[in-house]
Amino acid sequence: TLKQEVERLEELLQLPTRPDYRYEIARVVSRDFNSWWQHLEIRKGGKHGIPTGAPVVFSGGVVGRIIEVHEYTSTVELLSNSHLRMAVIIAGDNRPMSYRGSGFQTLQNPVGIAEYIPNDINIDDPSNPPRIITSGMGGVFPAGLPIGYLRRLRPGASGMFQDGDVYLDKRLARLTEVAVLIAVEGNYQ
């Protein structure tokens, strides 16, 4: 049945229960080599209740957000896209920082950039780097979704903060199925 298929896919994607959202599982149907780290197309659209601005996730965390909705497909702006920006925090530290995609990537490890990192943050153990998660600010991404790991720090332009490289999940390069988070109430505009 359809319900069993949804349960199978949710288990496959290992998505946590979120009472304020429902998951709409979608297959990745198109990804252009010229914009591999910028956008992808999914086979769910307006007919399936997909709203513009909705977060897109997989078991490794954030994939991106819906930027264009058609009748049966939608375009996802990826986490690695330099136009995608969001408020983030380091897990266990509630001070907000800014995240943005770094734009051009190779087909290896996708990397983003964290900005406004407090100067007292260090990477003490490279084998256990600080984990970057969504802060919940901004109204699009709920709090606590994994983004990646903070790997390299450097002085920020103002000298008051640091900037750093955020290593994203390698599986972002080969996604075949994702989940769109749709708020039970409200919209994303």
Predicted regions and their residues:
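A secondary-structure micro-motif
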Residues: 8-189
